[in-house]
């Protein structure tokens, strides 16, 4: 089998621009394309959520991929598949649909109790089994199935159990990538026992009748990766930030490969971006001002000459720094900035953010929805981006931001350290801080604002940031070698 014929199937719960919740969506939007550039054939499978616009993304039905039977122990659910090409590529992307499971919801909520947990487990099991049933009907045999995060973690186990006797899957290898170790997919065992055969349930990673899907993936996969060497080092340890992954790796004697995320310049380049108000480059930055004006208009904030526009774009949870941001708002607003907060999640954080909108309507604005086009506008229009993460695997938002001349203020954790050079005298591409505290965040914002108001410091910093090289090339080469090693080439 030649290198050109090696086939990789990527499985994920989110792929940009169709659905974006975390940085995984951006990984899925760009990385498979770079793998094709390395000589592999790539395809993608994801759920067809109700919020995905068929017409906008040119999804179409595939007659031979309709009415696929998905057997879940004592019942059979039907699966239909739609297909389109990943934008700006020829990569076939398959959307698995069942009205009961995916009509209204856009994500697999990680809920561990009550009816929501039962429903979520049904979605997960249906999707994971559905991927393998779709491959059987399609007749396209991947050499490697590359699974991403806990919601795809059943596939390696299913291949070893329910599908072990299928000749079609003989010699198919599995790779599992951890993008967020703190989201592990913990659910009561009883919900899986309702849907899966005993041989599958016996292979679930289960402690005190609770299944851990992330650990289930680790237990059965043949190759394990994560999004940066620094984050891999963190996960190998026994600190709270490893979330138990290090212990499980030791028990399995499984190496964890850290591979730095990259950025696809075909999708993220302010000089050619069709989704922003006006394009710009280091040679002419006037367009960034126009994007700032439009972003302010969209967020219903007034224009303020000389006042920096600062943003926070993330899921509202403690690990991505939403609580720290909420605790810091008083000190941040006092530094004479305008702040846009884009995201959703923890209801207490949402409420606290809205209280500041009421108290400071000309300085603070919050928006939950973030389409692909709006994300591009936000990245282009902001001056500074806050990333006060407690834990960060690598992320890609800071790379997009720097490419668009938006300077990140980020906590020095995980892959952040490998992608942002801390600002110093005539050096740096962003601002890093160590302490996960109000003082750490607000103090580093103060440092950034001093540079912002300095006519020599700021333009030089922006130019350095925009000149950063975040190419996927080296990572794609490294992944290509991992794939070939896995296939015994």
Swiss-Prot record:
> Which family is this sequence assigned to?
Belongs to the glycosyltransferase 1 family. Bacterial/plant glycogen synthase subfamily.
Known catalytic reactions: [(1->4)-alpha-D-glucosyl](n) + ADP-alpha-D-glucose = [(1->4)-alpha-D-glucosyl](n+1) + ADP + H(+)
Q: Which SUPFAM superfamilies match?
A: UDP-Glycosyltransferase/glycogen phosphorylase
InterPro entries per UniProt = Glyco_trans_1, GS/SS, Starch_synth_cat_dom
Annotated ADP-alpha-D-glucose binding lies at 20
Alphabetically ordered keywords of this record: Glycogen biosynthesis, Glycosyltransferase, Transferase
The entry's protein name is Glycogen synthase
The protein's job, in short, is: Synthesizes alpha-1,4-glucan chains using ADP-glucose.
Record-linked Pfam families: Glyco_transf_5 (PF08323), Glycos_transf_1 (PF00534)
EC top class named in words: transferase
Q: Which residues form a coiled coil?
A: none
Question: What GO molecular function terms would the record report?
Answer: alpha-1,4-glucan glucosyltransferase (ADP-glucose donor) activity; alpha-1,4-glucan glucosyltransferase (UDP-glucose donor) activity
Query: Which GO BP terms, alphabetically?
Result: glycogen biosynthetic process
UniProt pathway: Glycan biosynthesis; glycogen biosynthesis
Record EC number: 2.4.1.21
Q: Keyword Glycosyltransferase on this protein? A: yes
């Amino acid at each position: 089998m030649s290198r050109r014929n090696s086939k990789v199937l990527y499985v994920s719960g989110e792929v940009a621009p169709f659905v974006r919740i975390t940085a995984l969506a951006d990984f899925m939007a760009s990385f498979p394309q770079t793998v094709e550039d390395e000589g592999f054939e790539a395809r993608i499978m994801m759920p067809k959520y109700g919020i995905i616009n068929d017409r906008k993304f040119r999804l179409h039905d595939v007659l031979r991929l309709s009415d696929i039977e998905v057997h879940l122990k004592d019942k059979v659910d039907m699966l239909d598949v739609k297909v389109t090409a990943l934008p700006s590529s020829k990569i076939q992307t398959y959307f698995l649909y069942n009205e009961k499971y995916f009509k209204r919801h856009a994500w697999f909520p990680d809920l561990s109790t009550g009816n929501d947990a039962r429903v979520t487990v049904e979605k997960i099991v249906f999707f994971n089994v559905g991927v393998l049933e779709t491959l059987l009907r399609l007749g396209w045999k991947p050499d490697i199935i590359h699974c991403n995060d806990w919601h795809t973690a059943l596939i390696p186990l299913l291949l070893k159990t329910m599908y072990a006797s299928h000749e079609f899957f003989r010699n198919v290898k599995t790779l599992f990538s951890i993008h967020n170790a703190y989201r592990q997919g913990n659910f009561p065992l009883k919900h899986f026992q309702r849907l899966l055969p005993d041989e599958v349930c016996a292979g679930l990673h289960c402690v005190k009748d609770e299944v851990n899907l992330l650990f289930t993936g680790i237990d059965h996969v043949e190759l394990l990766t994560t999004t940066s060497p620094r984050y891999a080092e963190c996960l190998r340890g026994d600190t709270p930030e490893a979330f138990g992954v290090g212990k499980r790796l030791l028990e399995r004697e499984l190496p964890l490969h850290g591979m730095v995320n990259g950025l696809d310049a075909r999708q993220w380049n302010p000089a050619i971006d069709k989704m922003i108000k006006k394009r710009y480059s280091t040679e002419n930055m006037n367009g960034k001002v126009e994007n700032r004006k439009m972003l302010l208009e969209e967020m219903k904030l007034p224009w303020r000459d000389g006042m920096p526009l600062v943003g926070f774009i993330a899921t509202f949870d403690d690990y991505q720094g939403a609580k720290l941001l909420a605790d810091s708002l008083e000190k941040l607003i006092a530094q004479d900035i305008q702040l846009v907060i884009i995201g959703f999640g923890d209801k207490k954080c949402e409420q606290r953010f809205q209280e500041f909108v009421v108290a400071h309507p000309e300085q603070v604005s919050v928006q939950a929805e973030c389409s692909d086009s709006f994300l591009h506008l936000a990245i282009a229009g902001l001056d500074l981006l806050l990333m006060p993460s407690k834990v960060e695997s690598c992320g890609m938002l800071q790379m997009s931001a720097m490419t668009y001349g938006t300077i990140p203020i980020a906590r020095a954790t995980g892959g952040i350290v490998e992608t942002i050079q801390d600002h110093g005298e005539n050096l740096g591409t962003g601002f890093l801080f160590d302490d996960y505290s109000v003082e750490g965040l607000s103090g580093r914002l103060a440092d950034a604002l001093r540079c912002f108001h300095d006519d020599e410091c700021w333009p030089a910093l922006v130019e350095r940031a925009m000149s950063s090289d975040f190419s996927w090339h080296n990572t794609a080469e490294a992944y290509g070698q991992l794939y070939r090693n896995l296939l015994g080439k």
